[in-house]
Amino acid sequence: ILTRHASDRDLARGGFVNSRAAAALARRVAAAFDVRKSRPDPEARALSGGKLQKFVIGRELDRAPRLLIVNQPTWGVDAGAAAVIRQALIALAADGAAVLMISQDLDEIFAVADRVAVIARGRLAPARPVADISRRDIGLLMAGLPAQAAS
């Protein structure tokens, strides 16, 4: 919590951490994203990979950023947690934030994205509306074929 929120005046002032505010933030994020803990205030290293992933995503979304760049947001989490994370990303975008999601999970891409761009061989294909692109199109673009061949 602390490194991400070091500039938050409610959490840190003059180099000192407000431990009560930090603990309250951690509890709020854990509750919102159903991060179950074996003890009340565990260190991050005590959380499983999936629990840590949910917590990190929750921590970032808690600040309601205007821009969020997220890589593999549902990696390592169960299906229920993945649905919660995806819905939170959709809600953030619906509130006007720009969300750039990098994912290898096509189901996730089709569930969350408005537009899809594919990187192949170091080149970025033009972004296309998700409604105008198929899994086959994405596969062809991933193979490095020209965009018109994927249409």
Where are these regions (language model features)?
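Glycine-rich phosphate-binding loops of nucleotide-dependent enzymes
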Residues: 1-151
